[in-house]
Amino acid sequence: MCASLNEVKKNDTYGVSQKGYNDNFSESEGVLHGSKSMPTSMKNMLQSPTMVNMCDILQNKEAANDEKPVIPTTDTATAGTGTEDISSTQSEETDQNSHLIASEILEGTFKDVSYKEYANFLGNDNNNQVLTEFVKLLSPLPSSLLETLFNLSKSIYFIAEAQNIDRILECLSIEWIACHPNTHWKSGYKSCHIVLFSLLILNSDLHNNFQVDHKKIKFSMVAFINNTLRALREENEYEELKIYSREHLIIEELSEYYKTLNETPLPLCTESRTSINISDNQSSLKRFSTLGSREFSTSNLRSVNSNSTTLYSRDGQVSVREMSAKSNKNFHNNHPMDALYLKESFDDGLITENGSSWFMDDLILISKKSLPRKYSKRDKDQVAAPKMTSKRNKSFFGWLKPSKTTTLIEHTSRRTSLSYLNKDSEWERVKIQVKEGRIFIFKIKPDVKDIIQSSETDSATIDYFKDISSSYFAYSLLEAEAHVVQDNIIIGSGAMKSNVCNKNTKRKSGNFTVSFPENINGPKLVLEFQTRSVEEAHKFMDCINFWAGRISPVPLTQFEAVSNAEYGWSDKILTEHASLNLKNIVVSEWKPLLGLELLYEDAKDVEMVELKERLKELMNFTRQLGIWIDKHNEIKDKLVEIWSFDDNYFEAVMNNWNSRYLYMNNQYKKRLSYLKALQKAMGSVQF
C-alpha cells in the first residue's frame, strides 16, 4: 500500500452539466490540416496546434436529466453524545464501512446502485472516503500513468458524469504520486491529473465514431502532446517544482502513450468483471469525455493568435484590458469616433442594412461570466473607471489550475467559452450593434420589460438604449475573431426567454464567441453570446470577421524582419554546425514582434486600404504563410539532430520552434477566417 490519501483534503464542488456539440469547419481549414501534416520522421516534438480544450465534453444527447438515477451517498457518523470515545468509535466504523463498500465496488457486488453507476457513486462529493478507499485498493499502482488508467478502467465501469470522472482521476493522481515520488513529475499530482484526463479524452477521440461534418477526424500525436503540454504549463506546480526542466522526457512519455492508446483502447468493465473493447460500445461512448472539434478555437486552451502573444510569457506584470480606452471614452461621452476603415462608395448603402456583412443589430444574450468585471456593476453615468491591474500568472495557461473550491472542469468553464455547457450559467440581455469596425454592447437593465425594437444608428436611438442599460461599452474589432460554437445548445438559467425571442419558435438557438487578442493593455478576452438561431449566429460571425479582416493589417513584418538573435535555426547553424562550438551559442527566446495593434485600440494610425486591396493582401499573405510554415516544418528534423547533444539547448530550441509554429499556424487560420468573410461580402458589392 502506498502513502495515505487522507493527507490531501478534497473539497472540490461542481455545477457543470455539459452537452455534445459539433463545431463548424471551413473548407480552407481542412486544407491547412492536410498540407501541414506531421512528417513521418517526427517522433518526439510538437508540430500541429490543431486541437481543442481538454474540457469540451460530449455527453449523450438522449440522456435527459430526469432519467439520471439518484446516486446514494454513504452515511457519515457523528458523535451524538459528544464524548471522545463514541466519536472515535463512530469514526472507525465509518472507515470500515467505506472500506467495505469500496471492496464491494471493486468486486462488482455492491448492490445499492447499478454497476454502471459505480463511477458516479465514487465521484459523488459526499463519498470521498469511499473513493479514497477504492483507490487504495488499486495499489500498488503501475509506474506508467497510462497503465494506471488501464487498471482503473478494468476495475470499474468508467463511464460517468464529467465532474465525477474528474474527481476520481484527481484522487488517483494523488495516490500515484504517493506511490512514485521520485519521477520527473516529483510531487506534482495536479500535473498527473491533467495527463490522466487528457489520456481519457484521447481514448474517446481515437476510438469513438463521433463525426464532424460527416468526416471522421482524429487527434494527431502532435495535437495531443501540444494540448496536454500547454495545459501543464499553466499549472503553477509545473513551474514551482521545475517539472518543466524535464519536459523532453514528458514529450517522449506522451508520445509513447499516444502510440499505445492508438493501438489498444481502454477496456470497458462489464458487470461480470470481464473487459470488452471500448470501440464495441459506441452508443455508451457518447457519454465519455470526448472532444467536439479538432479546431484550435476560441473555446480552446489560450491560443497564440495575435502579434502580442508568445508561448512562454512567464514573467512581467500586465494590466487588465483597459476598458476606458479611447473608443470607449468617446462612446460614453457622445464624442465622434475615429474612422477605422477607408470608406468607399458602396459602403453608404450597406452600413445600415441589418443582417448584412456590414451591419448586425439585435437583442441577444451575453454570458454573465464573460462580461468585463469593470462594467458588470457600473452605473450607466460612470464615464471612466480607474485602471485595474493584476499580476499575470507566471505560467502561461493559468485557467486550467484547479482552485481550492473547484475542480478542473468547472474552473475551465469560468475562464473559457464553455458557459453553454454549464446548466448554472447566467445570461443577460444585451443589445448588440456591429458596424464600421466596432462592436457596441448595451447591457439592458433587468427591470426593463418593453423594449423598442430599433436598429437605427442615430443619436436618439443610441441615447434610448443607453438610458435603459446598466452599462454600455464599445470594442474595436482590430485583430478580433468570431466563431460559431455549436449548432445545438442546451442551456440553463432561462436562456432565450420571452423578452428576447418568440416562445413559439422552434428554431434552435445559436452561440458565438468573439475573442480579442492579448495586447499591451491586458490579456486575451472572450465574449460569449447566444442568439435566436444558428443562422443569426453565423451572420454575427460573418459581420465581425468581415470588419476585423478589413481593418486589421496583414502582419508581414512579423515574417519578413531579420533578427540578429539566434533562435537555433540561423543559416549559419543549419549549414556550419559541424564546425561550430554549439555550447558557446547563446539561444534567445523567440517572441513575435510588437505589432502596432498592441499600441492602439482604435488603430487610426494603421494604414487604411481599399476593400479589394485588403482582399488581395490576405490572399497573397495566406499563400505565402503556407510556404513559410512548410519551410519551418522542414527544418525540424535537422534541429533535433543538431541540438540533441544537450537537454537544455534542445529544450530551448524546440520551445522556440514550437512557439513560432503555433504563432504562424494561428495567424494562418485567423487570416483564412478574414479572407472567407471578405470574399462573402464582396459577392454583394457592385464595383
Curated annotation (Swiss-Prot):
UniProt xrefs under PROSITE patterns: SEC7 (PS50190)
InterPro entries reported for this sequence: PH_GEF_YEL1, Sec7_C_sf, Sec7_dom, Sec7_dom_sf
Annotated GO CC locations: cellular bud neck; cellular bud tip; cytoplasm; plasma membrane
GO molecular function: guanyl-nucleotide exchange factor activity
UniProt-recorded name of the protein: Guanine-nucleotide exchange factor YEL1
A Pfam family hit: Sec7
Region feature (Disordered): 14-35, 63-97
Biological function: Guanine-nucleotide exchange factor for ARF3 required for localization of ARF3 to the bud neck and tip and involved in actin patch polarization.
Modification type Phosphothreonine: residues: T290
Highest classification ranks of the organism: Eukaryota, Fungi, Dikarya, Ascomycota, Saccharomycotina
Family that this chain belongs to: Belongs to the YEL1 family.
